[in-house]
Amino acid sequence: MAELKEKLFSEFAPVSTEEWMAKITADLKGVPFEKKLVWKTGEGFNVNPFYRAEDIEGLKTTESLPGEFPYVRGTKKDNDWKVRQNIEVTCFKGANEKALDILNKGVTSLGFIIKGSDVNAENIATLLDGICPECVELNFNTCNCKAEMLIGILADYFKGKGADLEKCKGSVNYDPFKKPLVKGKENENWVEAAAAVLKAGAALPGYKVLAVNAFYFNNAGAYISQELGYALAWGNEYMSQLTEAELPAAIVAKKIKFNFGISSNYFLEIAKFRAARMLWANIVASYNPECLRDCENKGPNGECRCAAKMKVHAETSTFNLTLFDAHVNLLRTQTEAMSAALGGVDSMTVVPFDKTF
């Protein structure tokens, strides 16, 4: 293994930070360095135009490895992500045909948006006909009041097809905070309802059933720090309220999925996903989640570190899509998707460039 401080290009004399600053100051010809080259972000901190190895000395995160707590560099050892496309279901047969078509074109994750009144076993069977639930990540967005019912229908359908439920991966987007967030109306008794959904979700071990839809903030123009802060507070509210309702912390944490937006702020978006995983890992660890199976991924006090892994889906922003030169949106969504990929998300959706039309 190469040494971290191995000297490369030793034939060139080292240049100190002071020498760099002297050269930059001379080239600026009197223009203040802070004014011309320091990026003052909306998040409240300044970004310098160059950094040196000395700037990261003492940072523990530089020693983190992929798949290791606190998951700064990802919750797994590779950086594979799923390509997800959402389908708004108006005709279940037509949606099934659309799903099969895009799967053959390379999509690896499907998202179905279904009206609550349409949730029944017959429609779900039509929708999923010919789709292997063990091979394709399946995600469902429907009315909160039908989430528990939908989970039961899916579990029965997968069993009927002889699928291994441990291998079936996906999510049901139960979101008790959308109503107060988007409509300003209080959602009473959400803890009891969320607990019922969580208990129903035990039938689908590989499914996340509690959603943190942080993309609402992103699409409303929030700064990255605001989106991240609200998302973590949202996730912590699940943990706090449901553990008080005597549900195990490990079970609650493992059923939460974070859905972030992706803005055009390339480097800070990469940092956002890395910071989100690290912060969430520490939040979950503070609840001392008990390991529910024989596993080597434990903390110093025996707490479950698998529960501290953040499941992240990301979707390119709609806040900055333009109507007037729509093909510019192709460039924006491209850079947004790239930052999410480098940031280590588990799946992503790139919205159509003409979505605003």
Name each model feature, range by range.
Residues 282-287, 298-301, 311-321, 335-357:
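Structured mid-domain segments that build the active-site/substrate or prosthetic-cofactor binding neighborhood
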Residues 324-336:
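Active-site-adjacent loop and "lid" segments of alpha/beta metabolic enzymes
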Residues 1-265, 269, 290, 295-298, ...:
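Catalytic alpha/beta active-site cores
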Residues 269-281:
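Extended amphipathic alpha-helical segments enriched in small hydrophobics
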